[in-house]
Amino acid sequence: MITQYKKCLAFAAMACAALSPAGAVEWSLTVEKNGATNVVTAAGNPFAIDVSLAEIGGGWSGRIVNREKGAIMLGFEVKADPQEVVEGKSALYLPHVYGRRIRNWPVHSVTQPGVQMWRETENGVFVPAMSKWDVSTGSRPAPLPYPSKLATMQWATLNDGEKGFYLASEDPLAGAKDIQVVYDSNAKRVTMGFNFPMFLPEGETFSVPRVVMKEYAGTWRTAAKMYRRWWDSCRKVVHLPASAKDFTGFFMVILKQQNGEIAWPYTEFDSLGDAALAHGFRHVEFHGWGVGGHDTLYPEYDPDPAMGGRTALVAGIKRLQARGLHVSVYSNGQLQHQGGTKWYDEKGYKCAVTKRDGKTMSEHWVKFKNHPGMTFDVACPSAPDWRAQMLKICLDAQELGFQGFFYDQIGKQWPSPCFDARHGHRPGAFVFTHDRETMLLDVIGEMQKTDPEFVLWSEAFNDTILDSVGFYQGLFYVTDAGYNVANRFVEGVSCDMFPEMTFYTFPELIMTDRNNTSLCTRTRANGCAVANLRVDFEVRYRADRDYVERGAAPAPDAYAKIRSKPSEISLMKAETWRANRDYLRCVSDFRRKHGAILLAGMFKADEGFSVKGGKKIIANRWDGKNGETGILVWNADDTSAKVSVAFGGKFVLASEPERGEVDADELIPANTLRLYKFHSVQET
């Protein structure tokens, strides 16, 4: 029973949800319960509605109509009443970048270099400090905008290992929304919810998508399964190419930089192939491959005579492919050089995301101290000319012989309102939502007509583009993923990277970590493997090439002109080059050898097995076909560890990258992976 008061609908219950639209609007709320619906309507001043979780039942949805004269911008908040946090048990799981798990709850402001922590906003109130761009102030929660790199999925959960609270938006059109989280350290409670931003012209309607808030029994994996069941009801994962079975990471090379400096011309692709294979890669991808180099002249990409021209490029691609390498190429999925191309002058100027004041949404990229950089408009994915150009450049790349096409930035961008009606949407519509998804679906549909194995890449993952994009370059502010996975052992860490959340929800997902230094340490290679991440390996500058080819440590001034230098230059030592290179290749070969499990298997995280022993052990499970199960264990400690693995199948073997098959009872050496293989898995 819902009781109406002057400005709210209130109840008495331990858990509730509140909706707070702002502005003079007419609204309605549909509350589901036991298959029936109750519709509540009202109009007037800002207000709040409180409804018990018992009343919600399956979920709710809503409708807002602007009856004001003129347009209004407003937000519609849906949030659960504060959920109790049990110190030492409760963890908050957020779909941030790779996935975030928050386990340690703060009592005061804490900062620690290299570790994502909480940010105090006012007395006893904290928000997760998810990025250096988090500018939350006062009591406003830190927004995680979906769909984007900051909120890759429409769900989150608070769980104590036995039960949890599930928050999800079941919105098949992937409309703009923010996941909001606030922690009150005095009450020891966390508040979770959604905000739906909107721009409503007079007389128009906004439909609030279905929101689910419910308590459940089980671990965080139960919440992941609930979300995946809904996702499967309205979407599907794109066909993955056969090359996915060998994909342990990719060797990315910027052939020509923004300032015109050439690091690797087309005529020297043979040595590029040597370096890629020596590091264990079967996939290469080229940035800065056109006349303009990297971060200029977008979206025009023409083979560069200075690097050898079209003939040399086509021949070089064929030679790489003859050696078993899969070759892909770069474009930017949203940037267009402002006034710098024929494209912009003829069509691009009318494709930009346009603000309410008529100014365009833009970015300025400057890579070198001796170069002015370039300004780009952000293109609207609804604009017909932009959509046509994104398909055209992909078709052009396929004609050159490329097997995959990389759209930079396309997965990371968060929704923004665009006011240019020439794009086919109403003024103020939030773009980078369903329009991004359909643009990429149109591209992959055309590409796979002639080559079913053609694959699209994206920088950054979000689940709206899983039906078109096969490979993802991760985006984690260029930090070392192996180190961050190991961060879960660092005392006092509030937030740790938790890729298990994302990969358990979408075990088909193929995504790399992110690192801007031309090396991969042993720790990083192991951390990526156990977390189901592939390895991102980037060669950006001439000094990078010298290091990956022959171990020549960079001179002190090698990166002097560069504004954003590689983050781990100090590790680029001649004496460790060969060991790092060879170990990365060893782990890559190991993952391919057991690829039916570790690369093509279904990622199950920590489900259905237990591990005892060791102080710093991370272990995850994969199920292959034909009843095979693999449990990969990483001893992240600097000393050997005695470890035992319990699983309900028949033990087959234990194997390590360097030593091959080993006795399962042997100590696992320091910073070493071990795969325990079983047969006839139990149903879970």
Question: Which residues fall in each region the model found?
Answer:
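Polysaccharide-binding surfaces and accessory modules of carbohydrate-active proteins
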Residues: 27-42, 47-179
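Active-site-adjacent "subsite" loops/lids of carbohydrate-active enzymes
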Residues: 261-264, 312-313, 318, 328-400, ...
